[in-house]
Amino acid sequence: MQVLRHSEHTLKTALLSKNPDLVSQYEKLDAGEQRLMNEAFQPRNNLFEPITLHSQSDWISSHPEAPQDFEQFFSDRYRKAPCPKKHIIYIQPIGFLGNTRVISEEYIKWLKGYCEAFFYGLKVKFLEPVSVSATKCSFRVNENTQNLQIHTGHILAFLKRNKPEDAFCIVGITMIDLYPRDSWNFVFGQASLSSGVGIFSFARYGKDFYTSKYEGSVKVPQRTVSSDYSIFDNYYIPEITSVLLLRSCKTLTHEIGHILGLRHCQWLACLMQGSNHLEESDRRPLNVCPICLRKLQSAIGFNIVERYKALVKWIDDESCGESGATPKSSSEHVYLPKPVEAFKDWREWILRCIAVLEK
């Protein structure tokens, strides 16, 4: 295990920059916002922890990358930011996301509300779910795990063709596992930053995926015909638990963060850290560090305390929308509270940040 501790000077420079104009820009921020972000380089800061590497298989150890400070983010000429003509985050479900239509709709509402709070100030719109066959993507049964997988490159091409004119980006989400090419076992997701499109799967976030109890394996191994999408009829969808919801929110916001121009964070424990495996992804916090928070604020223009309060409200609102759901049939109407148990510690952390902002 290794703890990555940067010096106060390094973190301060990464946050403020050496560019006098960017330093001046920082000094014009609200006093509370400066106070919170300055926690990044305070010796006894207890809000933003250093990064801890647990093994050589962790992302930073196995994927060396140059770090991105605020100045590099701000001056990146290839970075795309939302503008009045392209300001909406579109999310395209591929197939159903819940084991009934109503549960799928509730889950979509929860994700939409979370994204709107996290990217406070941007609009988030969910498009009507499309079937796998509508994308005309290639697919396969994984030879090792015997679960269904769809081809990321073909999904990205479908999303690019169907990207609305006012979209800042469009991201596809699915409960079906993904693969980028025949030689790969799987991939959690893939994005094209230049095109503003991405596709991400939550299939491996179910509680049983990595156990012998996993129910999503195709029972009888079979050769798939590229045009026969009937294999996806009644495909397995994991239960929407609090942990699965948390993992989904993490992945969605991390990847949209990339589309906004944020690279993998190497400064402090942060949502924007890379992850090589599910265990490492679970260790990542839901929050962004002060350096990435400044990047996000610069791209979107939100008030930080209002953003944090919106996130607390999302956690406290037990249900988004009036409809309920049932695990038995989509016609039965049962109240479905939002499963936010896994978010409770983060809620307390946000309240501590709000206290610093409003001091």
Swiss-Prot record:
GO biological process: proteolysis
EC numbers, comma separated: 3.4.-.-
Tagged with keyword Amino-acid biosynthesis: no
GO function terms (MF aspect): metal ion binding; metallopeptidase activity
Cited PROSITE patterns: ZINC_PROTEASE
Chain positions recorded as Zn(2+) 2 binding sites: C265, C270, C289, C292
Cofactor(s) listed: Zn(2+)
Pfam family, one: Peptidase_M54
Keywords: Hydrolase, Metal-binding, Metalloprotease, Protease, Zinc
Catalytic residues identified in the record: E255
Cofactor: binding details: Binds 2 Zn(2+) ions per subunit. One is catalytic, whereas the other seems to have a structural role.
Positions bound to Zn(2+) 1: H254, H258, H264
Annotated family: Belongs to the peptidase M54 family.
Record's function text: Probable zinc metalloprotease.
PANTHER family referenced in this protein's UniProt entry, alphabetically: ARCHAEMETZINCIN-2, ARCHAEMETZINCIN-2-RELATED
Protein name, entry field: Archaemetzincin-2
Species of origin: Rattus norvegicus (Rat)
Designated gene of the protein: Amz2
